[in-house]
Amino acid sequence: MNSLRPELLELTPQALTALSNAGFVKRSLKELENGNVPEISHENDALIATFSDGVRTQLANGQALKEAQCSCGANGMCRHRVMLVLSYQRLCATTQSTEKEEEWDPAIWLEELATLPDATRKRAQALVAKGITIELFCTPGEIPSARLPMSDVRFYSRSSIRFARCDCIEGTLCEHVVLAVQAFVQAKAQQAELTHLIWQMRSEHVTSPNDPFANDEGNACRQYVQQLSQALWLGGISQPLIHYEAAFSRAQQAAERCNWRWVSESLRQLRASVDAFHARASHYHAGECLRQLAALNSRLNCAQEMARRDSIGEVPPVPWRTVVGSGIAGEAKLDHLRLVSLGMRCWQDIEHYGLRIWFTDPDTGSILHLSRSWPRSEQENSPAATRRLFSFQAGALAGGQIVSQAAKRSADGELLLATRNRLSSVVPLSPDAWQMLSAPLRQPGIVALREYLRQRPPACIRPLNQVDNLFILPVAECISLGWDSSRQTLDAQVISGEGEDNLLTLSLPASACSPFAVERMAALLQQTDDPVSLVSGFVSFVEGQLTLEPRVMMTKTRAWALDAETAPVAPLPSASVLPVPSTAHQLLMRCQALLIQLLHNGWRYQEQSAISQAELLANDLSAVVFYRLAHVLGQFRDTESEARVEAMNNGVLLCEQLFPMLQQQG
């Protein structure tokens, strides 16, 4: 039998799941295995499946799967449509040739895209006029995909545009699909063998300045951000919030006037960290606040450098509009969503308590989060993990998979659900759900993660539409486990992945809002009948070590959301298991501690002490050949406050670069 529908042969079970849902695919495969195989025939250029119960499904040439006609009476997608494709694939499996796969040419779709409604093409042109940038992925053997600022497009068939899926509310043949095809065509014309590229769309009819600071609005934004940075470094964030209110407000309004989404989002995140510091929030992290402040200024500096390279004919690594998030919408409506939990974190401060649950869309790999908070007075009777969200207990959501209709995603990755858009189903999280996920979220081991962290762009140019320090790693064996009472932290060292240096450090601090999480972690790592096989969590550098803070631990049979534990589990083992940091690590930790001290208390209140500490530290850094960082610390004595602030920001960024480099060296 000759293959008349090559696009159907390209649809993998993962693609069919994305185009329909996991339930239809699972049931279809089971029915085919049980012998319920429909009769496949062709009639008038249409593929027809006739089932034993009389149901007839017809898919015409050029139709999307959901456009197929089926006599079962189902509204929209049904299992018969999925079984038609799977049966056709099985029928063709024995007759397919083993010819080498032809190179993908998305240009074949341009003519078809030109026939789309005017409204769709105008929306695409409007996005191009804003200078939109698109991240393209085309690795051999994998599904071509395009990541736009607020949506993701995947081409499940290289033969038919009808099987392209976007996660926006339209789902397919939308303006995002149009732009993705155009970007691939333009990029392949210059780099035929591309596997990963960031491509900027340019309009022939609209010209915009190549210098982001050439106009008054851009220049004002940079000045207000610099003034805010100077005020925070010199005065310290421990000063009353009223001291910084006006500076934050001016910078935020200036970023919004420029429509620079990642600059305004950086300001929002920094303000949230400062507020968390004053509210004594359990989720406040001094190192994170330090990075946010340094990256804010560096983002604008990088934008100017990218614009400069572009102006002299060089191709910048990242377009400046991507760096600042130019023209990115605040919200985007999403299509039918199937989300897999990555974990939950409970938190509290002096007035409120709350939680945040992270999910990933297995079809696109994007990460979303769901957040809620309540008055602290309700915490004793209603702990965060037992609160109900959309009629489901938070703990069940944290350890489950959810399906939602007509949701929205904010620019920072928050999942927005109105009361009427309730979650339609929640099922327990299974190991199979995580196995469907791919890199960079799911890494094959700690060695691969170190390499990924070393190679990825610095934080100051990465987009802020989702968290990028959340990963899933394999766990083979727990080597050591102990409770550090001085740090109130449970530490473990486990084998993760292949390689010589494959020891992963897990560290989970105790928290009053999830007091039994550490006990559950200890119990899971000690059990042998159903050992931990995978772990999700946030990576950072603790005591000089690349460390993962666990959120969910997956055994062979089930998932355990650690912060969802509401009862005592087992006593904690008492021992210190972390290795003594190397001299180089200790120096970087001293440098980071000095910068945190300056951030908290302000330069002007500890100038002489800070200069003395910086000079001593610079001498020690020079002894281990950290000459650049030593030079930066030497600039702290500079009498010009602007130069000193720039030096402190550079010190933060250098430490961030050096920690992964030391890890890579072992």
Positions of PLM-derived features:
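Long, low-complexity, compositionally biased intrinsically disordered regions
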Residues: 1-666
